[in-house]
Amino acid sequence: MRMLDFFVFRDHLCIVFELLSVSVFDLLKENNYCGLSLNISRIIIEQILDAMRVVKEARLIHCDLKPENILFK
C-alpha cells in the first residue's frame, strides 16, 4: 500500500493511502449481509489486530475504523 499524500487538519496529521480493490463492507454486501465464515472472519480480525498494534506502537490514532475502510488488495 502506498501513501499518496498527507496534510495537517486542526493540528492532526492526516495520511491518504491508495484505494485498494475490495473492502470488508463489499464482502458483506456480496454475501447479502449474512456475515462471513468463521475462517474468513478470523483472518480479517487477526490482520486488523496486527495493524492496530503497529498503529499503537507508532503512537497514531485511526479515527474512522469501519468495514468500508478495511481494504484488501
Write out the residue ranges for each language-model feature.
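Short beta-strand micro-motifs within the conserved protein kinase catalytic domain, predominantly
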Residues: 2-13
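Conserved alphaE helix
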Residues: 11-14, 19-73
